């Protein structure tokens, strides 16, 4: 009653005798009181899940027992299952012998007695023995059926039946992976992984060098042994047809990796090897990498997702061993360290670039064999007019009419070698060196075409002459502009100069990059027009070649 101490008006309950009240209660009322007290103050020793009031307890409405009903259902279901099993293969007698003699049928003439058990006489121990006996008999029947196709149960239960030991036959089934002549199961049932490859057939094809077998796929075959993988690697040493060898998720270890390494040293036809998701350690991977030093054919190698971690030392050793390799293009492994990862990326990029250059060189050689001597004439024809528009306008910026002549000659030159294969006649000898070019007032010499024909000139001297001539021209232009800017107002000539500015000059103003020494003929012409004036123009006779 201490729980009501927080309420008011408890004085009227102080005179009540609790013992008298409890004595006056009946048994049912006492049970209800106990339940109420359990709800108010549950037992702290009980777990939380058992402290609440049970709401599933109900009084039975008749002679019903739930436990007896559940036991009856279990027994009936077991009997139904046994009847179904026996109905498929016939009536099979139940043996009461020990578990050691379950798979052996004795030669004795004793008949197996069938006992019928009632529900009242069955006990738990006998039920367990009966279930074990029926399961083991079913296994023996299924194994015998898988080996011999059908089982004659009359001969099994006959008096003069010979002993049939199925253990050795079951072991033979496991060794041959279920491949029997009379077995009509599908390949998916033979290999639960879904790989339809038949191991023995594939090995025979590799040994016989079958031309149709270009890929050996052993992926996801779990029951393949390491000795079988070693046999595959040894058979591939002499094979010249197989290009791809993949054995991912086959539980391959270092011994299989060593065999693959020995195979790669000898075989010069396999281009793709996949050993992902296996039990290979760093020792086996390094053996394969050392074998690649003697292999110049393999282009793709995958060994990611191994059971053992490679480690930093193994990754660095892999990079060292692959530095000299020039044929590997794809490597299926994620390096943990950034240093080996970047080094391996650069190695693979280098190899791909070498392959690309090799391919381009082969294409050029094929074109050379097809073209023959005509290619030389084509190259000479292309090379002769290409150099003319870059040098001539710089030496003659003061005479505007000469520049269009050069442009016309440049435009008219490509037609001459096409019409007549021999080269054009040589022009007159060149003028004296840059002593006449330095002073700005006199016009420059005629177009320096003979200099282009000279083959023995030095590039450094030509560049120096161009730079000196350009500086002299710029100095002369600055002097003339300084004198004439005051006299000339804002005229139409300035607007023309601004409109004739090339795109390259606008880009050069934005950036601080120096101008390139070589420019096109159009830009040189525009520069000469902007730097010239009407007073500088002179009449020039048209040359005989253009009349």
Curated annotation (Swiss-Prot):
Residue ranges of coiled coil: 16-41, 113-148
Keyword Transferase: no
Keywords (A to Z) from UniProt: Actin-binding, Cardiomyopathy, Coiled coil, Cytoplasm, Cytoskeleton, Disease variant, Phosphoprotein
Tissue: Specifically expressed in heart and skeletal muscles, with higher levels in heart (at protein level). Not expressed in other tissues.
Chain intervals with Basic residues compositional bias: 477-487
GO BP annotation list: actin filament organization; actin filament polymerization; actin nucleation; muscle contraction; myofibril assembly; pointed-end actin filament capping; positive regulation of actin filament polymerization; sarcomere organization
Biased amino acid composition, Polar residues: 149-160, 465-475
Entry GO MF terms: actin binding; actin monomer binding; tropomyosin binding
Composition bias type Basic and acidic residues, residue spans: 352-367, 494-512
Stretches for region Interaction with actin 1: 1-161
Gene Ontology CC: actin filament; cytoskeleton; M band; myofibril; sarcomere; striated muscle thin filament
Residue segments, region Interaction with tropomyosin alpha: 1-47
Region (Disordered): 91-162, 352-533
Result after altering residue 69 to D: Mildly impaired activity in promoting actin polymerization
Main location: cytoplasm
A Pfam family: Tropomodulin
Membrane-crossing residue ranges in chain numbering: none
Compositional bias per record (Acidic residues), positions renumbered to this chain: 95-104, 112-139
Assembly with partners or alone: Can bind at least three actin monomers and thereby provides a nucleus for actin filament formation. Interacts (via N-terminus) with tropomyosin alpha (TPM1) (via N-terminus). May also interact with TPM2 (via N-terminus). Interacts with FLII.
Disease in which the protein is involved: Cardiomyopathy, dilated, 2G: A form of dilated cardiomyopathy, a disorder characterized by ventricular dilation and impaired systolic function, resulting in congestive heart failure and arrhythmia. Patients are at risk of premature death. CMD2G is an autosomal recessive form characterized by early-onset, severe cardiomyopathy that progresses rapidly to heart failure in the neonatal period without evidence of intervening hypertrophy.
The protein, known as: Leiomodin-2
């Amino acid at each position: 009653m201490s729980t009501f101490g927080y309420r008011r008006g408890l004085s009227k309950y102080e005179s009540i005798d609790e013992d008298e009240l409890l004595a006056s209660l009946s048994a049912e009322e006492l049970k209800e009181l106990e339940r109420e007290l359990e709800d108010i103050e549950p037992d702290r020793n009980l777990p939380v899940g058992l402290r609440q009031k049970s709401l599933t307890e109900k009084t039975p409405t008749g002679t019903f027992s739930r436990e007896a009903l559940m036991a009856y259902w279990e027994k009936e279901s077991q009997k139904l299952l046994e009847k179904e099993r026996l109905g498929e293969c016939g009536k099979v007698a139940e043996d009461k012998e020990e578990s050691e003699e379950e798979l052996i049928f004795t030669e004795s003439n004793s008949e197996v007695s069938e006992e019928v058990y009632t529900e009242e006489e069955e006990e738990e121990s006998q039920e367990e023995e009966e279930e074990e006996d029926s399961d083991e008999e079913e296994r023996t029947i299924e194994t015998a059926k898988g080996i011999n196709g059908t089982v004659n149960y009359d001969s099994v239960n006959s008096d003069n039946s010979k002993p049939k030991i199925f253990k050795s036959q079951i072991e033979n089934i496991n060794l041959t992976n279920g491949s029997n002549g009379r077995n009509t199961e599908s390949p998916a049932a033979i290999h639960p992984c879904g790989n339809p490859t038949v191991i023995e057939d594939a090995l025979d094809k590799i040994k016989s060098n079958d031309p149709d077998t270009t890929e050996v796929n052993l992926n996801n075959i779990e029951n393949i042994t390491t000795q079988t993988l070693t046999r595959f690697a040894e058979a591939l040493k002499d094979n010249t047809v197989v290009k791809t060898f993949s054995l991912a998720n086959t539980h391959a270890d270092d011994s299989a990796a060593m065999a693959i390494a020995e195979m790669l040293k000898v075989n010069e036809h396999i281009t793709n090897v996949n050993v992902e998701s296996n039990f290979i350690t760093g020792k086996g991977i390094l053996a394969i990498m050392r074998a690649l030093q003697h292999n110049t054919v393999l282009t793709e190698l995958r060994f990611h997702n191994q059971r053992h971690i490679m480690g930093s030392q193994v990754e660095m050793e892999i990079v060292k061993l692959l530095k000299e390799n020039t044929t590997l293009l794809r490597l299926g492994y994620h390096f943990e360290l950034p240093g080996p990862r970047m080094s391996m990326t650069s190695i693979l990029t280098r190899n791909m670039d070498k392959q690309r250059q090799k391919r381009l060189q082969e294409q050029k050689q094929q074109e050379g064999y097809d073209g023959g001597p005509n290619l030389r004439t084509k190259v000479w024809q292309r090379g002769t007019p290409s150099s003319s528009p870059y040098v001539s306008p710089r030496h003659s910026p003061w005479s505007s009419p000469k520049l269009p002549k050069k442009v016309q000659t440049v435009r008219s030159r490509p037609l001459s070698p096409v019409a007549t294969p021999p080269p054009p006649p040589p022009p007159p000898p060149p003028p004296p060196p840059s002593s006449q070019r330095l002073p700005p007032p006199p016009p420059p010499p005629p177009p320096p075409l003979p200099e282009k024909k000279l083959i023995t000139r030095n590039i450094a001297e030509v560049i120096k002459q161009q730079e000196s001539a350009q500086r002299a021209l710029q100095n002369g232009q600055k002097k003339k502009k300084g004198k004439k800017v005051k006299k000339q107002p804002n005229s139409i000539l300035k607007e023309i100069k601004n409109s004739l500015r090339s795109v390259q000059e606008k880009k050069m103003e934005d950036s601080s990059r120096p101008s390139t020494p070589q420019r096109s003929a159009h830009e040189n012409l525009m520069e000469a027009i902007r730097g010239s004036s009407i007073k500088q123009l002179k009449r020039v006779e048209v040359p005989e070649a253009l009349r």
